[in-house]
Design a protein with these regions (language model features):
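Bacterial N-terminal signal peptides that target proteins for export
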Residues: 1-11
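Bacterial N-terminal signal peptides
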Residues: 9-21
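Right-handed parallel beta-helix/beta-solenoid
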Residues: 28-69
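Extracellular beta-helix/beta-solenoid repeat scaffolds
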Residues: 31-38, 76-186, 204-206, 210-240, ...
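Acidic Gly/Asp/Thr-rich repetitive segments characteristic of extracellular carbohydrate-active
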Residues: 52-83, 202-211
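All-beta strand scaffolds that present successive hydrophobic residues in beta-strands
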Residues: 61, 97-100, 123, 129-131, ...
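Feature marks extracellular polysaccharide-active and adherence modules
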Residues: 82, 90, 103, 109, ...
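Acidic/polar low-complexity surface segments
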Residues: 134-162, 179-186, 275-286, 308-365, ...
């Protein structure tokens, strides 16, 4: 099974081997490193192996008596917090320290403003870094800041570029002042020139000077996608707050319109996110050597209400990792090393004993503002909580699970917006399909595997997808057998066949604005209470492994775009497939060219083998679009003539017309077997079986394909207004 997994995910395996791969015999001794840890077999360099300043007692950072040198650490010092000592940072220092190694406890004062500038801050397995706690967060009247210095990476000591940032093997706790909520929906449309935002609930912890982000909510035309795209998201600043009204320092530059029904009634409004926190981790020079945070092995991480600004070093685009020769000497210094993200859980199994809150790592209420690739990355790390975070201005994706092993993590109520990317529309990309830039299409959320809980999240303004659940070539993966399992030990894992497994939960998520598809889905499972609006290509792109249920989806398009025949957005697009089982129940789709569209091309019919029964069922839907439902059914090839391999049933669904210009070559219809079918297809097609048309009991019939097919395909030649195809009762 493991062999199958490695073969199926060859690109990621090769990339990680290059980034973290084993060092040849003898090379490990060339420099001082930690013992091997999972995912970093060569160990992590001891950046402070030869400290110039060491703590000799517990005490304040500002007290010379705390230090071996009898002076406070200064420019270029290498600082070690010795085991058994608790040192409290109580200063604002602009001295650039080379490194800090924490073997004991390093705490930041919570009642006074603090700042440390350092090249590497490494928390050892028995060390502890604390910047506020749940019981005593950093006071809202002060700030605590760690600035990662812009220093060149030591190519001899650190050829795979783990350094320049925060490297965590021990306990890391950061609790800034609480902001509630971290993002929320507006109560009125924010239009260009407005100097006040009206929100739908009170805010707590927000204050003048805070930075807010507002997504681009347009439904893009075909000509506005890709290289032509110019984002209209905005970052603004609070001037004052009075109740639910937020005054801005400067007026808005753009309209940020909401979604409307086919009748023009305003139904859904955009969100705003607050990206200001009073605990700040940032790069000193975003244009230089940027910092990153990486948590590994048994790191016990709890970050709440922390601002992560201009962090992450891996860039969207082709990866270029460092190479070493058989002696461990550096052959090539990579220019775009994998695995250096703003926040990165890398094979972080968490503490052996589960923390009191039940999660092996916790990210709550944080803000990521600016990353050259991914914002929050979970890689072979499990049982975590990612909640109430705002991730803005990333490249590739905002929130990510990296290799598909990630399991039992809860992604709850996060807001990811403005994720730039390649714009490649590759719904089944994974690592193999998007080579050599995995997760680079531009997604708010990009989940490599199915084994997580995804609920109450919002994605906006992403180049490709709001949510990308990319199956690709993933097959069998090893997942933890229990909480706290070390998945580098085979005995502590169990296999998961991802082609059979269902996504654990995908409910109450929303995607909108300046994106091609709200959700790109590549797994089994159930999508519940999804809202998508102003997606330019599809609301939901479904390429299910075998079985998919879509319950209570709401999709809204900008009807004005349909004035152009070039624009062809679909509410739900079920890609070419054969043996799949798909149920769409209680859908409400308005303002699109097609409500539900599903093609079928004989030449591709075996491209996605599956274990379903080949059916599409639509039940109790409401459709007000140019075409309500267009499904291309099919029979098998002549050797199996008569056995349907793709069928469609529409039950108790309501269809209404949409007042937009008519294309005489493709007339509007409630249900169509003719709309954009493959011309000249010689095989007969199974009919669409309709019962309770327009929710009227007894109005039952079948719709047969009537165009570009041999004479005699349909058993009848009746027609009916609003139906594209022959109608038989």
């Amino acid at each position: 099974m493991l062999v199958r997994f490695l073969r199926a995910t060859g690109l990621i395996a090769l990339a990680i081997a290059a980034a973290f791969g084993p060092v040849p015999a003898g090379a490990q001794d060339a420099h001082e490193h930690t013992p091997a840890v999972s995912g970093v077999p060569q160990g992590v360099p001891y950046f402070c192996a030869r400290p110039s300043v060491t703590s000799v007692a517990s005490g304040a950072w500002s007290d010379p008596g705390t230090w071996s040198t009898r002076r406070v650490p200064a420019e270029n010092d290498k600082v070690k917090i010795a085991g058994g000592h608790e040192v409290t940072v109580d200063v604002v220092s602009d001295a650039t320290l080379d490194c800090i190694q924490v073997d004991g406890d390093l705490r930041f004062a919570t009642d006074t403003t603090t700042k440390v500038r350092v090249g590497n801050l490494m928390v050892m397995d028995r060390g502890r870094l604390e910047i506020g706690s749940e019981a005593a967060p950093v006071s809202p009247t002060v700030t605590a800041e760690i600035v990662i210095a812009d220093r060149p990476i030591d190519r001899a000591l650190d050829p795979v570029q783990i350094g320049t940032g925060i490297e965590g093997l021990g306990k890391i706790t950061m609790h800034g002042s609480v902001k509630t909520p971290t993002f929320l929906r507006l109560a009125s449309e924010p239009l260009a020139g407005a100097t006040t935002l009206v929100v739908d609930q009170p805010v707590s912890g927000w204050k003048p000077g805070d930075r807010l982000v507002i997504p681009d909510t347009r439904q893009l035309r075909s000509s506005e996608r890709g290289v032509s795209f110019k984002s209209q998201d905005e970052k603004v600043q609070i001037a004052s707050i009075a109740g639910n009204r937020i005054a801005l320092v400067a007026a808005l530059r753009y309209d940020h319109k909401g979604a409307r029904s086919a009748d023009g009634a305003l139904e859904l409004l955009p969100h705003i996110g607050n990206v200001t926190r009073n605990v700040v981790i940032r790069s000193d020079n975003p244009q230089g050597t940027r910092g990153h945070m990486i948590f590994m092995s048994r790191a016990d991480v709890d970050l709440r209400y922390v601002e992560v600004q201009d962090m992450g070093r891996t860039r969207m685009g082709v990866l270029d990792n460092s190479d070493v020769d058989s002696s461990g000497r550096l052959v090539k210094f990579g220019t775009n090393q994998i695995g250096r993200y703003a926040i990165h859980f890398h094979h972080d199994f968490g503490p052996t004993d589960t923390p009191a809150n039940g999660y092996h790592f916790t990210l709550v209420g944080n803000a990521v503002d600016g990353a050259p690739k991914w914002g929050i990355t979970v890689h072979n790390s499990h049982y975590g909580l990612v909640r109430d975070n705002v991730v803005y201005n990333t490249h590739g994706a905002g929130i990510v699970t990296e290799d598909g092993t990630e399991s039992f993590n809860v992604f709850d109520h996060n807001f990811a917006l403005r994720s730039e990317g390649s714009g490649d529309f590759a719904p089944r990309s994974g690592y193999g399909g998007a080579a050599p830039d995995p997760g680079g299409e531009g997604a708010g959320f990009w989940f490599r595997g199915p084994n997580n809980y995804i609920r109450h999240n919002v994605a906006a303004n992403a180049d490709a997808f709001g949510f990308g659940l990319a199956a690709g070539s993933l097959d069998v993966v090893q997942i933890p057998a229990f909480k706290g399992a070390d998945t580098s030990r085979r005995a502590e894992t169990v296999p998961l066949d991802t082609t059979s497994a269902a996504v654990l939960e995908f409910s109450d998520n929303e995607a909108y604005g300046a994106m091609q598809a709200g959700v790109s889905w590549g797994w089994n499972g159930t999508i519940t209470d999804l809202r998508v609006w102003h997606s330019s290509r599809h609301g939901l792109t479904g390429t299910p492994a075998d079985r998919l249920i879509v319950d209570r989806v709401t999709i809204r398009g900008d009807r004005s775009l349909l004035d152009s025949q070039v624009e062809n957005p679909a509410g739900i697009w079920l890609s070419n497939y054969t043996a799949k089982t798909i149920l769409v129940r209680d859908a409400n789709v308005q303002g699109m060219r097609t409500g539900i569209a599903s093609p079928f091309y004989q030449g591709l019919r075996s491209a996605e083998p599956g274990r379903g029964d080949g059916s599409v069922a639509v039940e109790r839907g409401y459709f007000r679009n140019y075409v309500g439902i267009s499904i291309a059914t099919a029979y098998t090839a002549s050797a199996e003539a008569g056995a349907a391999i793709k069928t469609a049933v529409v039950r108790d669904s309501v269809f209404k017309t949409l007042d937009v210009p008519v294309d005489p070559l493709n007339p509007p219809a409630a249900i169509s077997m003719n709309h954009q079918m493959a011309p000249g297809d010689p095989d007969p097609r199974a009919p669409i079986v309709v019962s309770g048309f327009n929710a009227k009991s007894g109005d039952d019939f079948k719709v047969y394909y009537s165009l570009a097919a041999p004479a005699g395909v349909a058993p009848c030649d009746e027609t009916r207004p609003g139906i594209g195809g022959w109608v038989c009762r």
